[in-house]
């Protein structure tokens, strides 16, 4: 049985359900671009000496595997298929791979479970890099790098959505924020915990899993980030790798160290980066702050809901006992006037309820000196004791900052 491997397996888990459940006619890829022509040939022209695994990839790359860049990494079934070609990079199955823990994708194709996958991805990555990938898996976001096939599907779906919106409202009014987190609409996986700190179930009104939604600015500019329910939890990863360490599985110790860096519920790469910097142990260069809730809901008082523009909000990093919320604001956070008014109203409402709202932007976090100044000031507000800034610690912290900010999801 062929098994997706490494980054190809990760790409599968990052593929939005809207894409995975679609199928395209390869001819739609002939859009005049070189990339479109290249992928069209891959999907329509059999490889020399094509075996069953390669043929399966060629046919399914227009369906449920279309979110995975080609050539994809695969542990094939037949020994003779261990030759790379235009569609498949063959990999040998990891010795630790437990067939009982593989997930069937139908048609004989398998994919490792998320915990198993991170054992594969541990090789060649640092603990910090692995921890950031785990933060994504345990968070409310996926970074999906579009393939040519996925781009064609999403373009078609976008047109259909716009046509439905026109039919519903009879015009173009009201399209602002039609697909993003920032829009004031029914939420899609934009909180991990309820007001009491209890973990949410991520179910829709009908009891099914909440759908994926593409993150956009309030003016509708698409990004590569999608809102989606978490794939796993930090505790599940820690428990799994603890058992793997006892069994002597290679890379399990590194995976366990990475899993201990993870907080559940990050809603963006910036939140994941900040969490690693501030909550990692001092031995890695972190400040080892007490851990908050990531994306916990706060319900506004009835008289403040008009000001806030909503009934409740999701706080990025919330210490509810201290009534302090740290907000991580990315480049497109205040993309326009409407976005600014929504967020300023939200902050004013939180402060009226006694919360202290602190903010840091991506630009401030990218600059090490600026970030250090801000994080030390945050520690004062929170009453946390920062790690002593010895020369040895500062060296570790600069290296941690370099790894965190250089990492590309």
Per-segment meaning from a language model:
Residues 161-165, 174-409:
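Surface segments flanking catalytic/ligand-binding clefts of nucleic-acid enzymes
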